[in-house]
UniProtKB/Swiss-Prot annotation:
Keyword field: ATP synthesis, Cell membrane, CF(0), Hydrogen ion transport, Ion transport, Lipid-binding, Membrane, Transmembrane, Transmembrane helix, Transport
Protein name listed in UniProt: ATP synthase subunit c
NCBIfam families, sorted: ATP_synt_c
UniProt keyword annotation of Transport present: yes
Pfam families: ATP-synt_C
């Protein structure tokens, strides 16, 4: 691979890391809203907890995909 293609691979990996930043912000916002909901209505904590765990797992898969793509771009696409 020439230097231009390697540079493009690094740019793509950097963009994938920016996507992971967005996932982290989204998970933080989701956690804040679930804590806020529990503070307002403590009786439904088990229902909110199960929904939050499911949504966090779905969100985290996006971060894992971006991380795997970044690793592949940096180490495999040489």
């Amino acid at each position: 691979m020439n230097i231009t293609n390697q540079g493009y691979a690094f740019i793509g990996a950097g963009l994938a890391m920016i996507a992971i930043l967005g996932v982290g912000i989204g998970q933080g916002w989701s956690a804040a809203k679930s804590v806020e909901a529990v503070a307002r209505n403590p009786e439904v904590v088990s229902k909110i907890r199960s929904q939050y765990i499911l949504s966090a797992a779905v969100t985290e898969t996006g971060a894992l995909y971006c991380f795997i793509i970044a690793i592949l771009l940096v180490f495999v696409a040489r």
